[in-house]
């Protein structure tokens, strides 16, 4: 390397006045260099006696400010210009030929780079064993230390810094230079806090399209292709590192981190990192497109410079000028005009003008060019240039000065700028760079927090031990007095005492052999943030083990009387009026535009890689902190002062609610007793309809979305039924209902509000139950939960007994099976929850008499339709009517469903359409038909008591047999020819969100039949302890769990949807009566969390990570998929039932259309029937049951 001189004196370019003393001067240079390279070995010796002051050429060595892979960086002062410089000292004896070539390549590359945001090379000196690289000194320290001391940067400040970084990296790329070790530790700040990129030890030259293959750099900043061991494009690697750097600037934390190198590698290769809430969308876009796994898809430097986020804020003409200059590759900064003012100043110092010009044109990087560059930089900073009086020999005035003072201090303390070895005479001292001393908080952490770049593997495992030994040719010098007299002899220079080797802030050149866990003096000594960001996996693992061995207790930062400056604001003046550091720190976190490191004490941000040990230590610190206890005591005092009036008002409100509840219950019981006492033998037969109306059993209601919905109608606007007959009450598809949904207050109408009609007689009830053959439906009913429904009854004018008999004997319950409503069930169950057991027993006693009185337990299914004592009543009107007994009596134990489920109910009431995930436990309509016919048909007046039993059993068997035969392709039953009026209809449900299935953005758009489950609550023998038909809901049911909900339910039907929302929020599904049951969701679906930017994990391939990821799916794709799932359910299953029930559908129906009941419709004709079928006299519609 021609540019590297063969000796320090020769490299200085100054004629040696005493050639015989050149060798002692070299020995004087070698001694401190050895000490610099082996601080551990010399530490004990330095404690007893400090080594003499070292001078290399025209530079006075001061302290160590950095340690690299193969070198040590020392802070020095140029003896002529008094400028601070950083000297990188490389021991050639410790390098093999390959690494030595890299050192020469670094020198060559730094000569090519003259940029305001790149550390500049001033001079190169070489001895037999050492290479000295004199570089620019950045007094602001690393940007990493700046982030530690001040927290994350606001995006405005981060943009300014990042622009300078991009300009410098772009400048390198335009000159075919790739850095390959960009990280926060290699980004330095000068005295004006401008960026200076340092450490080109891993840089290399590249050509367009050429791939590199050397694994180097810092693991947290390394691109994924480096971890994969592939050949890589150099500029793309730098762009990935730039993305990590920008994330660190804006967030104050690393996007990829791990406890070990393997974990870190896995996270980098996954490409997933966290985007905090405070990051802007434009900044996020820029980072995500720099951190893309595929190198070819990453942004180029030109695209980064033109990015929207980079162009925000005030205009930056300096950045634009630098970018234009980068694009002009052929324009070199070395062609700048020579500054005559600097040349004149050097001539006054005794430098030869011609030799200086020759050195500048030849890029010699000797003492002449170094002095010129330092003076030129000083002129740019201070705008004036004051020089010392001219002297032909620059070294002699230094030797004659006896007032040059130096002071040795402990390693961890700071050097007093007033005690530096400086030239105090002459005007040059006024313009010295003493003001560029590193910031105190940065200087206090240099050695204790050094982290190391992982470079090319070094086979010499014993390098550290060799470095600790004193190499041959580095003789020791006997200790001298601290302030010896300075004699005018050049050999006496080695007797000058040297300041202690101390941490600095300049030019880190990491050394792999020095990978050791750092001494933690940061952030309470807790967590991974106590270490440097670029540490490799080995150091991280040792550091974690060191953490685990530490005792858990109060943080030393909290108890220490002298907080470490790393976490507290720096008190430059040392004034006692400054607030408590913790108070200042807490106040700084209130600023929403700044973010401190995650593990700082009051920081709201937690590092993604923080482990359990860190959390536990933080919790222990909080528990032991006296400030927390003081806040708790203050909170308790405030509660005692202000909580009492609130509790009193709450108790008063609760008492009022309780009184209202008792009054309503008392009025309800009185009305029931008045109704039961007023029943007589000659009471009009239409009292049945009136009683069912009081029990909230209403005629059919309009669709939930219809303008005449009951939710929007007053309480007393339900129109009475028309007297014409049942046909007039029916409605076409989508048409308004003839009888509007009645408000909940109708439950408390007095008997005088509407006189009961007088046309329907009351029926006696047979006490004998027919036996039903067990089938497949029995097994289905045994394994499924019971449901409850409410039936609406239309008032029907019937003729004589024959007409009534034929009406009840025909299968005409299509509307009943079609319009089943979960809302009716919830409303009915809610109203019946007001019934107390004793009140129900009183009602039963007054309705049936003492002889037929039986105890009623609303939570047991032990009671049945077999009422003792009713056998002998015959046509007596003293007992309850058939529908009353059918609706108010518990389900019998021996009652069994038929073996098949009708296709209509499969379509309307299938588990998929009910959105609950359960199978269908509802009672098929043929059972209800048989039940109602058996109870509604009056027995002949002259028949013995057993005839009604036989006839009722015959009717039920006939109806069940007809339904079963129609589904099994058996010969159909004989059907009457006349048309019949429908007696029962089921209301449609209100809008209710489905809590369990994957839903689209609006469940109202899908309009699924959310809770269509069951006609009558039917229990088989194993289900005897399920809920009865009209049983009150459990007290723990979410909609009824509080008095507020109970009163809200009585006053407005809109609470149905609120209760469903409550059940869904609790993670429970509500059945028709509000009973909660754990939802059975599929494994592929998990509820979407709140879309908080800070709880979102980014994917480098432009996609958010799902909570449970699906391959290649972004958040928007997952959102669309969620809607698609719902649409698939609606389109594939339609109204014919779920896939499970479709497999059990019966053959094609062969019953005539005139008497085609819903119980025998196959799946092939269900859809057409629901949408278009209509009997001549009997109108009905499908009321938004998911069609």
Swiss-Prot record:
It catalyses: L-seryl-[protein] + ATP = O-phospho-L-seryl-[protein] + ADP + H(+); L-threonyl-[protein] + ATP = O-phospho-L-threonyl-[protein] + ADP + H(+). Disulfide bonds: none annotated. Its EC number is 2.7.11.1. One of its GO terms (biological process) is microtubule cytoskeleton organization. The modification Phosphoserine is found at residue 218. SMART domains: S_TKc, UBA. Residues 1-15 have a biased composition (Low complexity). Signal peptide: none annotated. One of its GO terms (cellular component) is cytoplasm. Residues 337-377 form the UBA domain. GO terms for molecular function: ATP binding; magnesium ion binding; protein serine kinase activity; protein serine/threonine kinase activity; tau-protein kinase activity. Belongs to the protein kinase superfamily. CAMK Ser/Thr protein kinase family. SNF1 subfamily. This is Serine/threonine-protein kinase SIK3 homolog. It comes from Danio rerio.
